[in-house]
Each structure stands twice: as C-alpha cells, then as structure tokens.
Amino acid sequence: MQKIPLTVRGAELLKQELQQLKSVARPEVIEAIAEARSHGDLSENAEYEAAKERQGFIEGRISELEHKLSVAHIINPTEIHAEGKIVFGTTVTLEDLETEEHVIYQIVGEDEADIKQGKIYVGSPIARALIGKEEGDTAEVQAPGGVREYDIIEVRYI
C-alpha cells in the first residue's frame, strides 16, 4: 500500500473534517432520514431521497478520509535534516527571472494543495523542478506556456 505524504497541518485538517462528519453531519442526516420516513410513502418522497443521497456522500467521504489517514506518511519539515535542500513540506521563496516577481510556495500533498494559499502539490511541475535544489540555485520549470526560470531566494522548514 502506497503511503500518502501529508504535512502535520494537512493531517490535522483531514482529522478535523473526519471528526465533523462523524459527530455532526452523520447524526444530522440520520435524523433527516427518520423525519422524511415519518412522512409516509417513500417512493415519491423527495426529502427522503435527498437525505439518503447526502448520507451516501457523507459515508463515502468518511471512508475516504479514514483510508487516507491510515496510509498517511505525516512529515514535519522542522524535523527533517535536509541541510538546506528543498524537500516535501518546505516553504520556498522564488524569484521569477522573467518578471522579477517573488512568490512563496509550500510543497504539500495532493489533498493540501491550494495555489491561492501558495500550497503546491509535490507532483506538480514546479515542485518537481524544486525538489533537491537549495538557496541560490536556479530551477527550470516546464510549464504549459513554456519554460520558466526561478531563482531560489529562501528555503524554510516551518
């Protein structure tokens, strides 16, 4: 079984979502199903059908989260002795050599990735180009719009 890399924060967020689904959403949908059943004929009961559909989604998501957490490889970047190299969980400041703009990214697992928050998936082209590099290096990224070059300004393990 392949391990799924997660940062400590990513694992916490999945655990929180799982807890919310089990302790709030699941009981609410069970109550909604019971309420809909009390209205009689289930064959044409839209409330019942909607509640059952919602229950299926909730149970599926609970299963998915439990699986992900069971195969998670939780990585704390502050505990990695990467000696200045960019690794999973690293936060890196880059300068786009074409635009001279600075961007900050954290390299995270697939479930945590959110470009708007500066979190990029470890399997993305930019993350793959950065892994193993260190401050002062230049990374070439094969992007859909062509090759982009970035200077690595700072590497942090936070």
From Swiss-Prot:
Q: Name one GO molecular function term.
A: RNA polymerase binding
Assigned keywords, A-Z: Coiled coil, DNA-binding, Transcription, Transcription regulation
Does Coiled coil count among this protein's keywords? yes
**Which regions form coiled coils?**
46-66
Q: Name one GO biological process term.
A: regulation of DNA-templated transcription elongation
InterPro entries, from UniProt?
Answer: GreA/GreB_C_sf, TF_GreA/GreB_CS, Tscrpt_elong_fac_GreA, Tscrpt_elong_fac_GreA/B, Tscrpt_elong_fac_GreA/B_C, Tscrpt_elong_fac_GreA/B_fam, Tscrpt_elong_fac_GreA/B_N, Tscrpt_elong_fac_GreA/B_N_sf
As for what it does, the entry says: Necessary for efficient RNA polymerase transcription elongation past template-encoded arresting sites. The arresting sites in DNA have the property of trapping a certain fraction of elongating RNA polymerases that pass through, resulting in locked ternary complexes. Cleavage of the nascent transcript by cleavage factors such as GreA or GreB allows the resumption of elongation from the new 3'terminus. GreA releases sequences of 2 to 3 nucleotides.
The record's listing under NCBIfam families reads: greA, PRK00226.1-2, PRK00226.1-4, PRK00226.1-5
Give the similarity note. Belongs to the GreA/GreB family.
Entry protein name: Transcription elongation factor GreA
Organism annotation: Neisseria meningitidis serogroup B (strain ATCC BAA-335 / MC58)
